Design a protein with these regions (language model features):
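Short, low-complexity N-terminal intrinsically disordered segments enriched in polar/charged residues
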Residues: 1-39, 43, 157-170
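A beta-strand edge to alpha-helix "cap/lid" segment located at domain peripheries
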Residues: 2-10, 68-77, 82-170
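Alpha-helix initiation/capping motif
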Residues: 11-15, 53, 102
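Soluble or luminal CAZymes and related metallo-dependent hydrolases
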Residues: 17, 59, 105
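Hydrophobic pocket/interface hotspot
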Residues: 22-25, 37-38, 45, 60, ...
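Aromatic side chains
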Residues: 25-29, 41, 47, 52, ...
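A solvent-exposed, acidic/Ser-Thr-rich amphipathic alpha-helical stretch
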Residues: 34-38, 42-88
Length: 170
């Protein structure tokens, strides 16, 4: 037998649990509760987005701790939460002050998830880097946001910032 999403009925409870996990994650994010966010991830989890392309394990929780601790004029809305027994997705839109430039950013992000043992094992955030860079960086983002050069520079700065944050926590 199948439910309304054409899944076997024995997978329906897992779908509901994974959907609740995604909602718990974004509710925690809206409160800037990085500890609750980190608790949603499997110890072997992997994360990627245009700024942090390859985080794993404890790096993910530390990224959220760093971002939540620095967040200014922050708000978050999320929608379109869906989950199956193995995969999920959500749409989310944070608004925040980018501290390096003092510019307001409204990012539009689509997230994809995979689950294992009732936790997030893989999380990929997709957003338009050029759009983000125009808002966050102003003229440099407008002129170079499409280029691999600027993306690599942002990734290097993000990695350096996370490494420094992690060394201070240790």
């Amino acid at each position: 037998m199948y439910n309304a999403r054409s899944e076997p009925l024995d997978r329906a409870p897992m779908s509901a649990a994974n959907e609740a996990l995604i909602r718990r994650f974004y509710d925690a994010f809206a409160r800037r509760d990085a500890e609750a966010m980190a608790a949603c991830y499997h110890p072997d989890a992997r994360f990627s987005d245009p700024a942090f392309p390859a985080l794993q394990g404890a790096e993910i929780g530390d990224m959220w701790r760093m971002l939540c601790s620095r967040a200014q004029q922050f708000s978050l809305e999320y929608s379109k939460v869906q989950a199956s027994g193995e995969r999920g997705s959500a749409h989310w839109e944070p608004r925040y002050l980018f501290s390096k430039t003092g510019r307001m950013v409204h990012n539009i992000i689509d997230a994809q998830f995979r689950f294992a043992d009732g936790l997030i094992i893989e999380h990929k955030d997709h957003f338009d880097f050029w759009r983000w860079s125009r808002q966050a960086l102003g003229a440099p983002g407008l002129l170079l946001g499409w280029s691999g050069f600027l993306r690599a520079k942002v990734q290097a700065e993000a990695a350096k910032g996370l490494s420094l944050y992690r060394s201070k926590r240790a």
